[in-house]
Every structure is written in C-alpha cells, then in structure tokens.
C-alpha cells in the first residue's frame, strides 16, 4: 500500500545543510591527481574489492574555510535527459530550477552536493543557471544507476582529484533491483588550492512511501552496505578527512542512521553535525499528513574533522 502525503523541505532551515568544513588543513603525500578538467569524472559500476593498499595522509596547517552546501533538488528533471525507468516523471518548472540555483548562490558555497538530479542534462542546466548568477562550479561528478531516474551529483569550484563513486553497490538480503542500493554512493575527493583534500560521500536512501515496513527494511539494508563501504574507506586512507551527507529518509534515532554512524569511541565513528537556522530550528522536512516535522537530511564527519571548531562553524 502506498501512502499519499504532501511534504516539503525546510527552505529556511536545512533544505540545504551548510557547513564550514575546512576547519583543519590537510595535504596528501604521493597522490596522483586526475587531469584538472571540468568534465564529469566517471563512476565505477561496482563496489571496490578488498585489499586496497593503505594510503598515508599528511596533515599540514589549517587553511581558509571551505563551504559545503547540500540539498535535495526535488526531482530536477529536464526534457533533454533520457528516461531510465518506466515511471512517469514531471519536468521541473523553470521557476523551481531557478529557486534551487538561487539557494546555492545565497549560500556562497564552493562545493555543492545534490540528490534527485535527473541526469547529465539536469546538471548542465543547473550549472548554466549558476553561471548566470556569477557562480562558477565547473567540476562535477554524477552518479546515475541504470533503471533509476534520480541521481546524485557533486559540483565544485575546486578540482575533483579522485572519484571512487559506486553505481551498483551490493545490498545483502535485498530481493529487488538486483540487490544493489537504489542510488549508489557518490564518493569524490576535492583538492583546494592550498593542497588540502576532502573526501565527500553523498547518499540518498530509499524513500518512505510504503506503509508495510518494506521501505524501512530497505533503508536498513542500504545502511549496512554503506557502513561496510565506510569501514573500508576509513581503513584504507589513514588521515583523510571524510564527510558524509545526504537525504537519509530517517531520523537520528532510527536504526539506519545509527548503523551508519558506526561504533562509538572508535576511529570508525561518524559524528553527526546539527546545523541550525536563524530561529534555532533543525528540521529538514515537513509532512502535512500528520502535521509533523523531521530531520531526515544529515551531515556526518569523521574524527579528523570533529573538533570544537567544526561544531562551532556548522
């Protein structure tokens, strides 16, 4: 059974999460960057294998703050993108696309993480609108799974020097969608002009449309798959600052989010930031059905980024 409900993202709160994430300075030794290009860096189709060689990351002095803005773009579909599923989609009105671009402009962010992007043409459309507003974010990553119309995207002012994104992430026990995460994992590393690196991961877990509990179960399974991926990522790069963001479709106390955070008091633990708006509110979505407010969009950082400065700047 499907639940019919009206919902809207908090435009005054964290329809976008904004965080000053460059509270520490970072550099990398023996790093081989990709060619500095504004073109999209292709994502892998499958999850990485085990046994990756440990990379050692050096930590230089602090640098200037870097601002990250994340947002669920709300079905950013444009006619130029091919349809990847049998579901009917509605193209996003020009006014709504302009509103997304304006939110990004107002944030002043150098890096933007997006979910529910309709494809390559949708990303180009947003970049074009940003450029008209004087915002240059030429570097990008797009993750689109076959059979899914909504994808993950990252736009950056700075070069993307590594892309380990996974389109088809295996999910244990999932009987649908060939046992993969619905929207994959965006995993890209951005390098600032002073040499610091930030590994950014974007996700969008299964929606909350089903009343029978299947959606919740799917999110939990996706969460375990993501947690396994995070464990490998943290173990394989010693000293890399890592930030996870996205639309989790679950609150802080829900099991999926708890699984993703990982075990307490270990290097694998992710710390959840709590950005607040000018009124001190933290909710990110409102459901008219039930008149309820929820925090489903989250931002997590690893121990390297979790300092008092990070908490103050969020």
Q: What residue ranges belong to the model's regions?
A:
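Metal-dependent phosphoester/phosphodiester hydrolase catalytic core
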Residues: 82, 193-224, 228
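Active-site beta-strand/loop signature of hydrolases that rely on acidic residues for catalysis
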Residues: 71-73, 103-124, 188, 200, ...
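N-terminal, active-site-proximal structural segment of metallo-dependent hydrolase catalytic domains
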Residues: 3-132, 140, 144-147
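Soluble non-cytosolic domains of exported or imported proteins
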Residues: 87-98, 116-121, 146-149, 179-180, ...
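Extracytoplasmic/secreted cell-surface and envelope-processing proteins
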Residues: 78-79, 121-125, 150-151, 209-212, ...
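Second-shell loop/turn segments in exported
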Residues: 85-91, 109-116, 142, 174-175, ...
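Structured beta-strand-rich core segments of catalytic domains in phosphoester-bond hydrolases
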Residues: 117-199, 203-205
């Amino acid at each position: 059974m499907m639940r019919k409900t009206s919902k809207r993202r908090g435009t005054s709160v964290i329809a976008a999460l904004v965080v000053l994430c460059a509270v520490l300075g970072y550099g990398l030794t023996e790093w081989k960057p990709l060619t500095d290009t504004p073109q999209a860096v292709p994502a892998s189709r499958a999850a990485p294998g085990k046994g990756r060689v440990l990379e050692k990351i050096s930590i230089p002095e602090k640098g200037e703050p870097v601002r990250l803005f994340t947002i669920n773009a709300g079905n950013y579909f444009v006619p130029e993108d091919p349809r990847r599923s049998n579901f009917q989609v509605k193209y996003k009105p020009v006014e709504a696309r302009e509103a997304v671009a304006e939110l990004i402009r107002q944030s002043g962010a150098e890096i933007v993480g997006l979910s529910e992007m309709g494809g390559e043409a949708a990303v180009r459309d947003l970049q074009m609108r940003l450029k008209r507003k004087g915002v240059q974010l030429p570097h990008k990553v797009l993750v689109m799974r076959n059979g899914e119309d909504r994808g993950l995207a990252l736009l950056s002012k700075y070069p993307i020097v590594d892309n380990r994104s996974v389109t088809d992430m295996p999910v244990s026990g999932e009987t649908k969608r060939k046992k993969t995460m619905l929207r994959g994992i965006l995993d890209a590393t951005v390098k600032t002009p002073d040499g610091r690196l930030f590994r950014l991961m974007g996700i969008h877990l299964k929606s909350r449309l089903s009343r029978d509990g299947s959606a919740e179960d799917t999110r939990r399974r996706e969460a375990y798959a993501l947690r396994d991926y995070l464990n490998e990522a943290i173990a394989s790069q010693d000293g890399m600052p890592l930030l996870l963001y996205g639309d989790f479709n679950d609150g802080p106390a829900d099991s999926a989010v708890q699984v993703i955070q990982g075990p307490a008091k270990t290097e694998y633990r992710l710390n959840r930031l709590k950005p607040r708006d000018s009124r001190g509110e933290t909710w990110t979505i409102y459901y008219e059905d039930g008149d309820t407010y929820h925090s489903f969009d989250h931002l997590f950082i690893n121990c390297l980024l979790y300092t008092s400065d990070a908490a103050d700047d969020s």
